[in-house]
Amino acid sequence: MPKMYVMCGISGSGKTSLSTKIAKDNNIKRLGIDDFYAKINGDECKHENTFNVWIAFFQEIQNTFINGEDCIIDTNALVWHQRMQFIEWFPNFEHHLIFIDAPLELQKKNNQSRRRKVPDDVINKMAEKLQKPTAELDKNWDSITYIENKENVFQQPKTIKGNLPYFFNKEIKL
């Protein structure tokens, strides 16, 4: 059964850096929502045509399943119902949630070095809105992994539920 790994965390937490490295090192298809904004709008900074962007994103996830491939999803998935959509809409995958936790100031600092900068007030709102995954809240996931990002050094992954994904059995260097 194909596996879906969904990255979860606030902008600037390190989701894209980590998911890109995992995908490259393990031959997993990486699907990032910002890449679909770039594809549809010609620029990842243009957050227009949202409906079309998400339709294309979800269609590519479905194509990944049809092809029997594993995928890693790079999106914020800040709240429970956003995360549940991946399980409800794509029930034929094994579902693995990877939460990256980082101090708010580090997220803001990382954000400043990105091409597509998220305003600080939006990052603050994300932090207020964030529902950190728990075994109780996110009980439908096959596994939940917690990773702390300290000064852009990812700490040893910990399991909240289930087993750690296989790619965390070795050191990941960015």
Where are the predicted features?
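Amphipathic alpha-helical transducer elements in NTP-driven molecular machines
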Residues: 51-58, 80, 101, 120-127
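Anionic, Ser/Thr-rich low-complexity intrinsically disordered regions
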Residues: 4-6, 53, 97
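ATP-dependent NMP and nucleoside kinases share a basic, alpha-helical "lid"
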Residues: 39, 65, 77-118, 129-134, ...
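Residue-level preference for the first positions of well-ordered beta-strands
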Residues: 2-6, 29, 70-72
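Conserved GTP-binding G-domain of TRAFAC-class P-loop NTPases and closely related GTPase folds
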Residues: 2-4, 8, 13, 21, ...
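Conserved beta-strand scaffold positions in the cores of enzyme catalytic domains, especially
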Residues: 28-30, 95-97, 143-146
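Phosphate-binding P-loop
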Residues: 1-2, 64
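Conserved substrate/cofactor phosphate-moiety recognition/catalytic segment
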Residues: 16-69, 106-108
